[in-house]
């Protein structure tokens, strides 16, 4: 169960949620402590609670589309788009989208690479909420936000299932609202 913290704009993991997260040292590379959300999401109703927590925080915000980052961002992004009744745009790894695509570079705490979006989906004034599973250093989310702005879109905010506060990733994300269903 996820317990909301009043007036924080985020939620905290209660004791059972903390126990459900698994940690894998040195994955995917040395020096990284990987936080695995899969066991937490396997709990009955957990995904619904995450989506409800984020949806309540963006209530009243104008959002045209959720941009969800490949692949675990799709977990939150698709469910949230359905709940909010807005569009859903996939931000994919190279070679996963057919047709014309636009690409941009990103870097995070353990890698760098390229992401792609189907050409023509983001246009002038499209209000986008960027969704991913985890906010660590903010590199992927920042690059995605910069891409949206380069296409004439606007950032309505950023949404994450889990935020690792000690890495201070939210400092990288403009002045747009940052919503994390859980923090650790």
From Swiss-Prot:
Disulfide bonds: none
Compartments in which it is found: Cytoplasm
NCBIfam families assigned to the protein according to its UniProt record, in alphabetical order: PRK02304.1-5
Pathway: Purine metabolism; AMP biosynthesis via salvage pathway; AMP from adenine: step 1/1
Role according to the record: Catalyzes a salvage reaction resulting in the formation of AMP, that is energically less costly than de novo synthesis.
Protein name per Swiss-Prot or TrEMBL: Adenine phosphoribosyltransferase 2
Catalyzed chemical reaction(s): AMP + diphosphate = 5-phospho-alpha-D-ribose 1-diphosphate + adenine
Species the sequence originates in: Rhizobium etli (strain ATCC 51251 / DSM 11541 / JCM 21823 / NBRC 15573 / CFN 42)
InterPro entries in the record: Ade_phspho_trans, PRibTrfase_dom, PRTase-like, UPRTase/APRTase
Family: Belongs to the purine/pyrimidine phosphoribosyltransferase family.
Pfam (any one): Pribosyltran
EC number, as in UniProt: 2.4.2.7
BP-aspect Gene Ontology terms: adenine salvage; AMP salvage; purine ribonucleoside salvage
Molecular-function GO terms, alphabetical: adenine binding; adenine phosphoribosyltransferase activity; AMP binding
Keywords, alphabetical: Cytoplasm, Glycosyltransferase, Plasmid, Purine salvage, Transferase
GO cellular component, one term: cytoplasm
Domain of life: Bacteria
